[in-house]
């Protein structure tokens, strides 16, 4: 596998005999100034990589918690350009990989080349586009790779086995294994078949595997680790904690939750 910021991070974490903690944060919820502080707080409290959502008005893969966060961020005037500006200002302070989570529409509106160029300029290491089918991934993957950005592809429990192998072989940085059928959101338990899917992916690709959608507490992180995955992505649970905290406590709440989750990674 090609050496990139993300692959080097996974290699380092593997040597430490633990899994990667990969929190998801919606950019601009409640505002970009707070997002910037939370990014640094997550880094300080053990996040290995951060998935940063670009808000979009029709987020098909997301459940109500992240949909509401996107809506609040859009109401606050968040746009891809403003997210890039914030990341540029943080570039010297952020030492861990930042992975942008964006739907196809904002990418197409800006132009694939322009989006990837701006992302690389501000230090972005990866890109996740949940509504991008495998058949349309090659062009974006090539553009992203030329800017040293990994295009990460998603595999779901309903993905046929042959297609799963193709996705894992095409995905760069890691393969994003969706742990549930349906949209993002907190779950009380994870689906039993995810462990066997992790093994299937391990058998067909050397790419690291990160499990996301529904990962919301220490118990889930431990489960993901037991399955043999390489990383756990925690989204809705963190977004909810930030939303429920007072404006003065949002940054601290994000940091303390991250610290709690990080302790379960080894």
From Swiss-Prot:
It is an enzyme of class 4 (lyase). Keywords: Amino-acid biosynthesis, Aromatic amino acid biosynthesis, Lyase, Tryptophan biosynthesis. Pathway: Amino-acid biosynthesis; L-tryptophan biosynthesis; L-tryptophan from chorismate: step 5/5. Its EC number is 4.2.1.20. The active site is at 51 (proton acceptor), 62 (proton acceptor). It catalyses: (1S,2R)-1-C-(indol-3-yl)glycerol 3-phosphate + L-serine = D-glyceraldehyde 3-phosphate + L-tryptophan + H2O. It holds the Pfam family Trp_syntA. It comes from the Bacteria. One of its GO terms (molecular function) is tryptophan synthase activity. One of its GO terms (cellular component) is cytosol. The alpha subunit is responsible for the aldol cleavage of indoleglycerol phosphate to indole and glyceraldehyde 3-phosphate. HAMAP family: Trp_synth_alpha. PANTHER family: TRYPTOPHAN SYNTHASE ALPHA CHAIN, CHLOROPLASTIC, TRYPTOPHAN SYNTHASE, ALPHA CHAIN. Tetramer of two alpha and two beta chains. Belongs to the TrpA family. This is Tryptophan synthase alpha chain.
